[in-house]
UniProtKB/Swiss-Prot annotation:
Ranges for region Disordered: 1-24
PROSITE patterns: MFS
Protein name in UniProt: Major facilitator-type transporter hxnP
Keyword Amino-acid biosynthesis recorded: no
Family, similarity comment: Belongs to the major facilitator superfamily.
Organism: Emericella nidulans (strain FGSC A4 / ATCC 38163 / CBS 112.46 / NRRL 194 / M139) (Aspergillus nidulans)
Membrane topology: Multi-pass membrane protein
Glycosylated sites: N200, N395
Origin: domain of life: Eukaryota
Positions in coiled-coil regions: none
Length: 495
């Protein structure tokens, strides 16, 4: 049994307090301690997770940079073997998200995220060295599959971990900050690649140095993370007791019906039979295709402009940096207005326009327009990753259910990377028009599904307002009062 509202100090009042009305609060939250708590979590927890995710993404996406330095020729890749290296990585990368997240709920994020990060560091370091000796498709494929197992679960686990500290209107921006480090990893991977590819060594190629150096850079951060991250706010070494009390109260006000609950599988899978679950599945499967296209194939797309290996890697930096800034701005707007669906649709539309331009013009004669389209793709492709998962978590007050749903939906999105990799076939080079068309189709499906879900939620909120004769929005009713979830009379969807 987790902590509930009865465990939290109530506001003093004369007589027996009535049940709180919409917009009122019975849970006392020390505002000064709350502000101090948020500042400390932003300072101690968020940066550590961002650094861990940065190196996580560096390891995952450097294959595209290595390709520009002659990886295919050096290990004799033939036909679609490069696409297979990416495609087969995404299978374990998607399948292991749910198990990792349930383990995080059972044993805490501090243990699972850090040990997983440390394990992948050791495994990747060993594999990087073995890769230098193997120099063949089979060896590299084995490395990618092992990497996929250990890389899985970090974003899903971090998303669930954030719900143990942040309220619903704080989630979007914090996830965007985390996601921006993935974008920065993609950008800096190009800069690091530029430097390492200049190393002239007869025995070790530039792309091999890339794997070795980026793998080694993750070791220290993985070890520190294990000792640095707290299990929950209640066990955080950097908080005072007053701040811990404020942390519990604020989560019961605007995140969870109960906190610090034990893992219960029945509760974890309780929403999987709901009719909306398949709609969420469509959304979380379709939006990541554009993200995977941008992350894994950006250097290849930019290479269509006809520049050298060095310039190709450098020219991927600017679109990613702009994409990171746009990501933070849109996510902050989403938190301020407590609105997700329209912001998601906006971002999907921006990346859709970019891909349509890339698919429809002759790149060799329209380099400026093509490069501008890369900026549009980067500006829109990264945003749904944080807002979609903030959205479905915002509409779920059960910790167990959030852990399972987030693991499944993030894993489903990771498997969607298979679609992106499968469509980047050598026979489609150099324009990759079928690839871009398929990605556009996925964006279109996601726009429709998101619009449907957002519209239905708005209509349902209005129906309840009409029945109860009062306009209530998500946030006015404390989540501690919503133990029955969507069946609670005062439930309102976070739009």
């Amino acid at each position: 049994m987790g902590a509930t509202a009865t465990d939290i100090e109530k506001v003093p009042s004369a007589g027996t307090p009535d049940e709180p009305k919409a917009g009122e609060t019975n849970v006392y939250v020390d505002t000064e301690a709350e502000k101090s708590f948020v500042r400390k979590v932003d300072f101690f927890v968020l940066p550590m997770l961002c650094l861990m995710y940065f190196f996580d993404c560096m390891d995952r996406s450097n294959l595209a940079n290595a390709k520009t330095d002659g990886l295919e020729e050096d290990i004799n890749l033939k036909g679609n073997e490069y696409s297979l290296l990416i495609l087969l990585f995404y299978i374990p990368f998607g399948l292991f998200d749910l198990p990792w997240n349930l383990l995080i709920k059972r044993y805490s994020a501090r243990i699972m995220l850090s040990l997983r990060r440390y394990a992948v560091t050791v495994v990747w370091g060993i594999c990087a060295l073995c890769q230098c000796a193997a120099n063949n498709f089979g060896g590299l494929l084995a490395i990618r599959i092992i990497l996929g197992v250990f890389e899985a679960g970090f974003f899903a686990g971090s998303t669930f971990y954030f719900t143990l500290f942040y309220t619903r209107n704080e989630m979007g921006f914090r996830l965007a900050v985390l996601q921006s480090f993935a974008v920065l990893a993609s950008a800096f991977s190009g800069l690091i690649s530029f430097g390492l590819f200049q190393i002239n060594h007869s025995a070790v190629k530039g792309w091999q140095w890339l794997f070795i150096v980026e793998g080694a850079m993750t070791l220290i951060i993985g070890v520190i993370g294990f000792w640095w991250l707290p299990d929950t706010a209640q066990s955080a070494w950097f908080l005072t007791q007053r701040e811990r009390d404020a942390a519990s109260a604020r989560l019961l006000r605007d995140t969870s019906a109960e906190i610090e609950t034990k893992l219960e599988l029945k509760a974890a899978f309780q929403t999987w039979s709901d009719w909306k679950f398949p709609i969420w599945a469509v959304i979380t499967f379709s939006y990541p295709v554009a993200y995977a296209t941008a992350m894994n194939f950006f250097p290849i797309i930019v290479a269509r402009l006809g520049y050298s290996v060095v310039k190709t890697n450098l020219w991927t930096v600017a679109p990613n940096l702009v994409g990171a800034v746009v990501l933070l701005v849109v996510a902050k707007s989403s938190d301020i207005f407590r609105e997700r669906s329209l912001h998601i649709i906006f971002s999907l539309t921006v990346s859709l326009v970019g891909m349509l331009i890339l698919a429809s013009i002759d790149v060799s004669h329209n380099k400026g327009v093509s490069y501008f389209a890369c900026f549009l793709l980067a500006s829109g492709a990264y945003i749904p990753t944080c807002l979609v998962h903030a959205w479905h978590n915002n509409n779920n007050t059960n910790e167990n259910s959030r852990a399972a749903n987030t693991g499944f939906f993030v894993g489903l999105g990771n498997i969607a990377g298979v679609l992106s990799a499968a469509t980047f076939r050598t026979e489609y080079a150099p324009k990759y028009v079928p690839t871009l068309v398929a990605t556009c189709a996925c964006n279109g499906v996601c726009i429709l599904a998101t619009a449907f879900m957002g519209t239905w939620m708005r209509l349902e909120n209005r129906r309840k307002d009409k029945e109860q004769g009062a306009r209530i929005v998500a946030g006015q009713v404390e989540t501690r009062m919503l133990a029955d979830g969507e069946k609670s009379p005062e439930w309102r969807y976070f739009l």
